[in-house]
Amino acid sequence: KFIRHKDESFYECGQLIGYQQYCVNACQAHGSKEKGYCKGMAPFGLPGGCYCPKLPSNRVKMCFGALESKCA
């Protein structure tokens, strides 16, 4: 379950110093029950993002489509 961010640098998996900790904090803020981490999606031709295990389903829906900008 990915979370997105309006800041484009959010997608650059592995490019940012402290990115893993950023994902841990971001996933925790979204209500993930487990530690989040950065996950690349290059093989699928997609940008990477923070992968949050066991994210509440209502939060997941909020992070896609028209409400994508609401994710912080």
UniProtKB/Swiss-Prot annotation:
Has keyword Secreted? Answer: yes
Domain (LCN-type CS-alpha/beta): residue spans on this chain: 1-72
The intrachain disulfides are 13-38, 23-50, 27-52, 63-71
Q: What domain of life does the UniProt record list for this protein's source?
A: Eukaryota
Listed GO MF terms: sodium channel inhibitor activity; toxin activity
For this protein, the record's Pfam families field holds: Toxin_3 (PF00537)
* Expression sites (tissue/organ): Expressed by the venom gland.
Q: Where found in the cell?
A: Secreted
Q: Which UniProt keywords apply?
A: Disulfide bond, Ion channel impairing toxin, Neurotoxin, Secreted, Toxin, Voltage-gated sodium channel impairing toxin
What is one term from the GO cellular component aspect held by the record?
A: extracellular space
The UniProt record lists the keyword Secreted: yes
Q: What does this protein do?
A: Sodium channel (Nav) specific neurotoxin.
About its domains, the entry says:
Has the structural arrangement of an alpha-helix connected to antiparallel beta-sheets by disulfide bonds (CS-alpha/beta).
Give the UniProt family note.
Answer: Belongs to the long (4 C-C) scorpion toxin superfamily. Sodium channel inhibitor family.
Protein name, per record? Phaiodotoxin-2
Please give the organism: Anuroctonus phaiodactylus
Q: Which gene encodes it?
A: phtx2
